[in-house]
């Protein structure tokens, strides 16, 4: 005979759990914003810079290779040129199988503007198609120069023939004609690059009253004995540019900028201290030059006016574009009616 046992009732009351759903405002990721602004290609679409042959080309692959490992996190904006010489008609110096790869990049990825120029000699095999990104047979490429853009003068020399004039600090002059396989859009990017390197972007500042930390070149340098006025007089006829040694390696360039920043701050401190001492002296005493001041080297050419911008900061405020091609395209529309000789 089966007996049914009634279930026991617990003496405590079971607590009811209520699930509370909290709603948080979701923000798109940085890559989503970059895609919305057109700075990154959408999934499934090819990068327009790769299609034009100005990004991820032979020069970029070479400097990012394990052999060089230069500026691994920076984008390289590059194109292929043919070196020509001046005459009645522009004539090619080398054979058609020899081209010059010219590109710009940044020593630090967060810089909105490039500050390094790359030059390489490319020798294509006989009968090889000169494709820029993924050639079937790797051509012979030789890296010729890595120069800071401060020591380079770049001009749009012949708009019709698509020729650039490149002059280095050693007075070496190159006339480079854009390869005929590149479309006209690529040359417009180079025109825009010359413009923004000369005038800057809207996000940059060249106001000397704004304190820019870790600036490589101080705004004003004075030499003992009052020679700064002589330097300014002698430099009026020179092209505006900036001069001081700049190391291309990222760690060394950051260390150099830190040294110049510390020297510049020390100079400001010592000059303010000397002014306080001069106030306490009698008016008959002459002010002595500061011992800690940085002397100017009068033999440096291409120094008319020191200009610096936000692209020379080690840590610019706010996120910056990661693509040089997108930086050129996102800036204001270029003025294509340029006269030969617009230089940076």
UniProtKB/Swiss-Prot annotation:
Its main location: Golgi. It comes from Rattus norvegicus. The keyword Oxidoreductase does not apply. Belongs to the GARIN family. RAB2B effector protein required for accurate acrosome formation and normal male fertility. In complex with RAB2A/RAB2B, seems to suppress excessive vesicle trafficking during acrosome formation. This is Golgi-associated RAB2 interactor protein 1B. It is found in: Golgi apparatus. Keywords: Golgi apparatus. The lineage of its organism: Eukaryota, Metazoa, Chordata, Craniata, Vertebrata. PANTHER family: GOLGI-ASSOCIATED RAB2 INTERACTOR PROTEIN 1B (PTHR22574:SF13), PTHR22574. Pfam families: GARIL_Rab2_bd.
């Amino acid at each position: 005979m089966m007996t049914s046992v009634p279930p026991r009732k617990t003496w405590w009351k079971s607590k009811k759990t209520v699930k509370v759903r909290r709603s948080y405002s979701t923000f798109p990721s940085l890559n989503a914003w970059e895609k919305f602004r057109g700075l990154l290609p959408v999934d499934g679409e090819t990068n327009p810079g790769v299609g034009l042959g100005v990004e991820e080309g032979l020069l970029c692959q070479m400097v990012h290779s394990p052999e060089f490992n230069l500026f691994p996190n920076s984008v390289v904006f590059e194109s292929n040129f043919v070196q020509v010489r001046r005459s009645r008609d522009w004539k090619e110096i080398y054979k058609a199988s020899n081209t010059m790869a010219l590109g710009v990049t940044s020593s630090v990825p967060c810089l909105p503007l490039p500050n390094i120029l790359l030059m390489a000699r490319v020798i294509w095999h006989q009968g090889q198609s000169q494709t820029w990104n993924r050639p079937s047979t790797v051509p012979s490429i030789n890296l010729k120069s890595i120069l800071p853009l401060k020591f380079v003068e770049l001009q749009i020399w012949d708009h019709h023939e698509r020729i650039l004039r490149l002059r280095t600090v050693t007075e070496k002059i190159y006339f480079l004609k854009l390869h005929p396989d590149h479309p006209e859009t690529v040359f417009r990017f180079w025109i825009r690059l010359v413009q923004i390197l000369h005038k800057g972007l809207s996000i940059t500042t060249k106001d000397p009253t704004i304190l820019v930390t870790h600036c490589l070149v101080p705004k004003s340098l004075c030499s003992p004995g009052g020679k700064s006025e002589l330097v300014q007089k002698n430099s009026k006829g020179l092209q505006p540019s900036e001069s001081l040694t700049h190391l291309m390696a990222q760690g060394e360039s950051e260390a150099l900028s830190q040294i110049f920043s510390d020297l510049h701050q020390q100079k400001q401190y010592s000059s303010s201290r000397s002014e306080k001492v001069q106030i306490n002296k009698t008016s008959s005493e002459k002010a002595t030059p500061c011992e800690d001041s940085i002397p100017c080297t009068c033999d440096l050419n291409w120094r008319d006016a020191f200009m610096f911008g936000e692209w020379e900061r080690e840590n610019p405020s706010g996120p910056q574009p990661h693509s040089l091609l997108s930086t050129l395209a996102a800036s204001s529309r270029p003025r294509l009616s340029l006269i030969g000789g617009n230089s940076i």
